[in-house]
Amino acid sequence: MRLYDTLSGGVRDFAPLRPGHVSIYLCGATVQGLPHIGHVRSGVAFDVLRRWLTAKGFDVAFIRNVTDIDDKILHKAADAGRPWWEWAATYERAFTAAYDALGVLPPSAEPRATGHITQMVELIERLIERGHAYTGDGDVYFSVATLPDYGKLSGHRIDDVHQGEGVATGKRDQRDFTLWKGAKPGEPSWPTPWGRGRPGWHTECVAMCESYLGAAFDIHAGGMDLVFPHHENEIAQAEAAGDGFARFWLHNGWVTMGGEKMSKSLGNVLAIPAVLQRVRAAELRYYLGSAHYRSMLEFSETALQDAAKAYAGIEDFLHRVRTRVGAVVPGEWTPKFGAALDDDLAVPAALAEVHAARAEGNRALDAGDHDTALTHAMSIRAMMGILGADPLDERWESRDETSAALAAVDVLVQAEVQRREDARARRDWAEADAIRDRLKEAGIEVTDTADGPQWSLLDGTDK
């Protein structure tokens, strides 16, 4: 198997540190708000990697963290008049619901940043002792100048680096980045040898990686927007602490709209509830996973409907075989399918094999060759199962699609409905109306009743 490693800048042969075992760390969500389809693409992409490695016989340890303490979380919770931990927990549930709706397997462990403060403090102490970090006005900073090859992941020249953290009086060098933030009034804080405070984002992931996977592990994954500064700063800390850290760095491309990254700050996000009105969850999963994980995925309604139609074609063939021939159990994937996934997870080529098998199977079925049709159907089930979208899997077939979508959407929407109620309680009518309008754009109608707010999909489905 070969994978593209961002650090080396090319495709390399992959072999795990421990034979038969693969360790993967995926940078998860900063739970500050509702997830959109851009957020969950990495979850789908690396779920395929995990499923493929498992199918090949590896024991996979898959860690996906939750960043539950962050400047944005604190600011948004404060603006809404809610405790920061409640805010984080609310949107953590929303992300979990989104992953589940799309059939992403639960991680082996899902550590929260706030549960690993002790490990972060210990890491920072090691960096200070080794001369790579220093204190200043209650904060702790990493000294970039002490690591000559800083920038090797992203290609940034060390002299051109600026961390963009604003003016900090305790910084010796504007290239340095924050490991620990000194306590501020009204913010959560924890005791440390250098005073109370809270962790910096880059420190959190290093501590959690090493807590669950050790000082050296196989794969660190995440979106391409994390290459700099987040992953660059993770490497800096780990190497400065004397650890080997990740052997492969994998990064998925963005979901774009109009050629720009899907982002709340750009106002071009597409909420999951809105998409689940147009296509089934399995079809959305198929769409998000159909492009090569490193490529950009430009969203369009046409592309979404084309993906739904392609998925429905696979589903229809499997149903035809089951009706005419009998039970269809997963069989063996084709050699070309396996070769495609071994070539840096080339899902488009793998899907071409699925559709070739479907076409041949349909011809065989029409000709009355039931044995050949069944063989192709069994192979398709195996291949689509590895891609997490087998139409005959109990996950997709046993649950009514509308009910399944509503169950996922309910968790996502309740978070925003609660925000609207909080705004109404503060008599912030403008904010309450803005939230209602955003929900409507996402395909959700909110109605105030004597029993409290009720929401419904604009297609008429009540909740």
From Swiss-Prot:
It is an enzyme of class 6 (ligase). The keyword Magnesium does not apply. Its EC number is 6.1.1.16. Zn(2+) binds at C27, C205, H230, E234. Binds 1 zinc ion per subunit. It holds the Pfam family CysS_C. Coiled coil: none annotated. ATP binds at K264. It is found in: Cytoplasm. One of its GO terms (biological process) is cysteinyl-tRNA aminoacylation. Its main location: cytoplasm. It catalyses: tRNA(Cys) + L-cysteine + ATP = L-cysteinyl-tRNA(Cys) + AMP + diphosphate. A motif ('HIGH' region) lies at residues 29-39. Its cofactor is Zn(2+). GO terms for molecular function: ATP binding; cysteine-tRNA ligase activity; zinc ion binding. Keywords: Aminoacyl-tRNA synthetase, ATP-binding, Cytoplasm, Ligase, Metal-binding, Nucleotide-binding, Protein biosynthesis, Zinc. It comes from the Bacteria. Belongs to the class-I aminoacyl-tRNA synthetase family. Monomer. This is Cysteine--tRNA ligase.
